[in-house]
Amino acid sequence: MTRSPFRRLVFGTLRRLLYLWVRSETINQSSLTLNLDRSRPVFYVLQSPSLSELAVVDAECTKAGLPRPVLPVSVGPLMEPAAFFYLTPEPDWLGRQDKRGAPPTLTRLVNTLSEHAEENAQIIPVSVFWGQSPESESSPWKLLFADSWAVTGRLRRLLSILILGRKTRVQFSAPINLRELIEHNKGHERTVRMAQRILRVHFRNLKTAVIGPDLSHRRNLVKGLVNMPLVRQAIADEAEREKITPEKAKAQALRYGNEIASDYTYTAIRFLEVVLSWFWNKIYDGIKVNNIEGVQKVAQGYEVIYVPCHRSHIDYLLLSYLLFKNGLTPPHIAAGINLNMPVIGSLLRRGGAFFMRRTFKGNPLYTSVFNEYLHTLFTKGFPVEYFVEGGRSRTGRMLQPKTGMLAITLRSFLRSSRMPIVFVPVYIGYERVLEGRTYLGELRGASKKKESIFDIFKVVGALKQRFGQVAVNFGEPIKLAEFLDAEQPDWRSQELGPNYKPAWLNETTNRLGEQVARHLNEAAAVNPVNLVALALLSTTRLALDEQAMARQLDLYLALLRRVPYSPHTTLPDGDGLALIKHVKDMDLLSEQSDALGKILYLDEQNAVLMTYYRNNVLHIFALPALLASFFQSSSRMSRDQILRYTHALYPYLQSELFIRWSLDELDTVVDQWLEAFVEQGLLRFENNVYLRPAPSSRHFVLLTLLSKTVAQTLQRFYMAISLLLNSGQNSISAEELEDLCTIMAQRLSILHGLNAPEFFDKSLFRHFIQTLLEQDVLRRDEAGKLSYHDLLGELAEGAAKRVLPAEIRLSIRQVALHRVDGAAEAAVEPQPPKPEESR
């Protein structure tokens, strides 16, 4: 563009037009002036072709009185039409660019100086940065267009000039003496390559210092994926299976790689930091971070895989933000392909998201590329984040783990265990989840809607609400090697086959998923909303006197301090009255006053929503609630009786709620809870027997409300058992039992005024039946029909009798007895309007 008089004239005109808007300055002009030998020819080198950057350099040289890059310069007999060149050669007229080729100007300079020992030349690397460094920039709009490591197109460069051009900075680096390189006597070609290498390293180091490190592995990694042995084999198999050429199959693999891979940029991380800092301060009253010190220790020397619970679309943004603010590398995040949409998908990808399809079934090539991508992340030590629950929990419970990503991780580790892997559970507890209103329909029983990032925008109108605080608790890490040592002691010496799928993989992966879920629940953050929901949803009319509620909340806190759920569980500050005030301030509680005091209650909408927050901590209160349930039908029980019934029911509660204590620990933990009950006046211990308080006493009310925490769960168990016993041996399949349980639960929810759709959630019945099979209480015959052990009858008439009121048991048995004649009608008969009260 500038290598002829006419082109220089055009260039000068363009430069003047550019500077109608652009304002530039040189960062370190004094250091350049001190090191420059003005008696020697000067050549400027820019990293890549850019007319706008050349114009800025030319303007700064003119301003500083330096030789201009666009004017001719001579070195001995060599006459160059311009005193600059690009390290990456300019494209030809067809747009082709040989990135590995040497700049012609540099080659001619080396040749000339090699032949004329008396001559010399100086090369000055020059970098142009549009706008401030990401570290200094506070405008999210400007950060979107700030310099990055990504290849910049013409449109983006134009936008960068328009948005950032008023703060353009030019950095002249120390001159490189070309004669000193030639004196190494390495020959012309090697000297040129050495000069190129020095310049590449220089530009990379300078760019790192100014805009931050190059966090993206995308440019090189995707091309490398298709050359890995397992992917090459998958490409060959794809070509043979689809009757296409290997080249086409390889091109398809490359497309998959580009679809999957993240494109980390420091600029995007800074953009998200600026935007999210504003967002958190705008929405939340604060973010509490607990136990991050353990993560900072374990991050050194381990491949860290963060496994958070999934309650909101902002979970991954929040976690990446907190890790970055605490000096930890933000992870590469597994995101559903539905989030890979224009603008949003690009920003998420540059913030570390890699995208995965919902199913890999029927696409072995995609599976191979995805597995290889994750294997590369793991072995290179990039931190990774994925959600073992799969999708967001719409009910507030910990969902059953989806083990696909865990299986890929396990297989990768079996393939190469040089980089040890550690799973870090992260519990994110919201006092008010951002998408709460969008969950209301599903909490009322509507079918689950397809996930979309636009769910976030649907709640913009509700941002005037108070969202309280967020707690982020890091749980106990799980070291994968230690886990495998316990599960498969000889895993290191086993023959694993070419696909690294040992026979024990599925079972071990399932146990790993359960352990991750338990560790997540151990790190729960109990907040005021959880406790208020727990108390009010345990009442018949969803209402309590304010003082009675304060006593109930104080009881919850006292019990959890006396018998901590785990060292990683956190509790709120303040007493019961302070917690009530906090929840009232968030407009989640309604209040009515009379002469006797204040009555606190839940309106219809908040009653449904509060089931979500109760479910967050259901696992923490399940065992003490079960113990309290024993004393609803019995006024006195011995320790042996309590332990016998607890052992009968606990495995099913533990399996559904991922409770942390093993059966071996159960006796000790039960004793601790019973001691706490005695200390709080909920029970008395006399003559080796535990006695409940008088039914008219305040303590009996507290004990009763505590017992209601797991009432619906125990009722579901009893439903399934009653239907099985009334069906007889080998007469019903698991699928038929699920359907009947769902119909029966729907009917009972209408009869008893329950507005809690999880009461008739088919997946919960399915899991209970599966647990009965695992406990060998049930068995399947060859036709898939269920037979049961005598223990099932004992479970129904022994344990259930102790924990469920007689009227509830009678109602369930009556519906179960009429299942044959009434099941079909119950499924289709019109339902009366839902009652006003819900719990």
Swiss-Prot record:
Its main location: membrane. It is a peripheral membrane protein. It catalyses: sn-glycerol 3-phosphate + an acyl-CoA = a 1-acyl-sn-glycero-3-phosphate + CoA. GO terms for cellular component: plasma membrane. SMART domains: PlsC. The lineage of its organism: Bacteria, Pseudomonadati, Pseudomonadota, Gammaproteobacteria, Pseudomonadales. GO terms for molecular function: glycerol-3-phosphate O-acyltransferase activity. GO terms for biological process: CDP-diacylglycerol biosynthetic process; fatty acid metabolic process. It is found in: Cell inner membrane. This is Glycerol-3-phosphate acyltransferase. It comes from the Bacteria. Keywords: Acyltransferase, Cell inner membrane, Cell membrane, Lipid biosynthesis, Lipid metabolism, Membrane, Phospholipid biosynthesis, Phospholipid metabolism, Transferase. The keyword Lipid metabolism applies. The HXXXXD motif is essential for acyltransferase activity and may constitute the binding site for the phosphate moiety of the glycerol-3-phosphate. The keyword Lipid biosynthesis applies. InterPro entries: GPAT/DHAPAT, GPAT/DHAPAT_C, GPAT/DHAPAT_LPLAT, GPAT_PlsB, Plipid/glycerol_acylTrfase. Its EC number is 2.3.1.15. A motif (HXXXXD motif) lies at residues 309-314. Pathway: Phospholipid metabolism; CDP-diacylglycerol biosynthesis; CDP-diacylglycerol from sn-glycerol 3-phosphate: step 1/3. It holds the Pfam family Acyltransferase. Belongs to the GPAT/DAPAT family.
